[in-house]
């Protein structure tokens, strides 16, 4: 299940040979560097890195420095083992073996290898993992799709959840009850997406359908099956 770290650029549309319109998500995936290789009996995985992070340095008195985290010496040392001059901005781990499928072919990679979009081909099925859009504190109508109360005959509880459980027995709210709360900003994996096009020159992958996350959000695209 080799994969690659990418950035969601947005959505567009493609047309197949029959003239049908296909909605697609465009994912930009610059070549990833293999930072570490895990190979045990129970786990075979790669640690991938992409982008570049600013390094720490001594600041002159009164000098204004840009905001954001800077890579420390441990991160730089880890990156130099893979032949990089700067620490990667984004690091993710990708599992190579498939649990429950011992016959699956496991690709071999070494520290410092590059992985680009050519690992995918049109027609393949992939799964995309990302962080959904954060929507803050929301009520049950938006968060869980409740129907709400009546809109007429003097009702004033249009978007309230209603009863949240029995009274005397058990005298508590059952765990897992759908109630208002924080909505979004969660890790989500969308499976069964088809690769429609691969543009190796521009490091782009066109995937049919929508993927989780906002524009410019970090995603991980992995082969499925």
Predicted regions and their residues:
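Extended basic (Lys/Arg/His-rich) segments that typically form rRNA-contacting surfaces
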Residues: 1-225
């Amino acid at each position: 299940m080799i994969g690659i770290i990418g950035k969601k650029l947005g959505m567009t549309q493609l047309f197949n040979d029959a003239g049908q319109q296909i909605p697609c998500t465009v994912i930009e995936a610059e070549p990833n560097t293999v930072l570490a290789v895990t190979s045990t009996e129970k786990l075979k995985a790669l640690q991938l890195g992409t982008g570049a992070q600013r390094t720490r340095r001594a600041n002159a008195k009164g000098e204004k420095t840009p905001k954001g985290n800077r890579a420390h010496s441990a991160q730089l040392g880890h990156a130099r083992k893979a032949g990089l001059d700067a620490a990667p901005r984004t690091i993710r781990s990708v599992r190579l073996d498939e649990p429950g499928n011992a016959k699956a072919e496991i690709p071999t990679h070494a520290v410092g290898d590059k992985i680009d979009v050519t690992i995918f081909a049109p027609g393949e099925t992939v799964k995309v993992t990302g962080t959904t859009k954060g929507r803050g504190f929301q009520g049950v109508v938006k968060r869980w799709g409740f129907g709400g109360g009546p809109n007429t005959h003097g009702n004033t509880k249009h978007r309230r959840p209603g009863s949240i459980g029995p009274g005397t027995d058990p005298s508590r709210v059952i765990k897992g009850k759908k109630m208002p709360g924080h909505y979004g900003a969660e890790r989500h994996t969308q499976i069964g997406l088809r690769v429609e096009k691969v543009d190796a020159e521009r490091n782009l992958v066109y995937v049919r359908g929508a993927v989780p996350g906002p524009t410019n959000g970090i995603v991980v695209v992995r082969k499925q099956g």
